[in-house]
Amino acid sequence: MAIKIGITGGIGSGKSVVSHLLEVMGVPVYISDEESKKVVATDPVIRKELCDLVGEEVFFGGKLNKTLLATYLFASSTHASQVNGIIHPRVKEHFRQWSSHKDCLDIIGMESAILIESGFADEVDCIVMVYAPLELRVERAVRRDNASCEQIMQRIRSQMSDEEKCERASFVIINDGEKPLIPQILELIAFLYQKIHYLCSAKNN
């Protein structure tokens, strides 16, 4: 049975880079942001509930209006809870189905910016936090999303703080542009295999 890791971090922290490097090293990673979009696009119940909540225009020409949904979601914590309450239960079930086909592997991952807030942390065995300084995160996100600093800061304020996430994490990866990532990821994999060995020993005893 595979050990499941949850990869999280704030906007612009570099979660996707870490997930990609893990995949290169043979660890498949469920990208919850991408997979949730697929679930939303194909689940008629979600489509109806989002239309009832946000308005029919949230699906423009049959496709999800991601900008409108994001604007609604980040407008308040109440809006975020409403949207997440519709989407997250289906994504959890989708992840369970995905991971059930990978039981023969040692390690699999799930990447989510809101791993802890969404309750996805309950689906994994340990949390990996990707940390980057706030200024660098804002710079990366502004460049990537073609958004203003204020828009990015609004999103950051809507999420759990880095300090809280680090406290919950079993392992922290520093992605500040100076500390090399690959040695840290190799250290993470070694840490996970130690955990696997411990779990196997405990089970055999």
UniProtKB/Swiss-Prot annotation:
DPCK domain sequence ranges: 4-203
Highest taxon, organism lineage: Bacteria
Catalysed reactions, semicolon-separated: 3'-dephospho-CoA + ATP = ADP + CoA + H(+)
Subcellular localization: Cytoplasm
InterPro entries found in the cross-reference section: Depp_CoAkinase, P-loop_NTPase
Enzyme class, UniProt record, top EC level: transferase
Keyword tRNA processing assigned: no
EC numbers on record: 2.7.1.24
Known role: Catalyzes the phosphorylation of the 3'-hydroxyl group of dephosphocoenzyme A to form coenzyme A.
Entry-linked NCBIfam families: dephospho-CoA kinase
Protein's recorded name: Dephospho-CoA kinase
The keyword Lipoprotein is annotated on this UniProt entry: no
GO biological process, one term: coenzyme A biosynthetic process
GO molecular function, one term: ATP binding
Primary location class: cytoplasm
Key words of the record: ATP-binding, Coenzyme A biosynthesis, Cytoplasm, Kinase, Nucleotide-binding, Transferase
Cited Pfam families: CoaE
Gene name for this UniProt entry: coaE
A GO CC annotation given for this chain: cytoplasm
Protein species of origin: Bacteroides fragilis (strain ATCC 25285 / DSM 2151 / CCUG 4856 / JCM 11019 / LMG 10263 / NCTC 9343 / Onslow / VPI 2553 / EN-2)
High-level lineage: Bacteria, Pseudomonadati, Bacteroidota, Bacteroidia, Bacteroidales
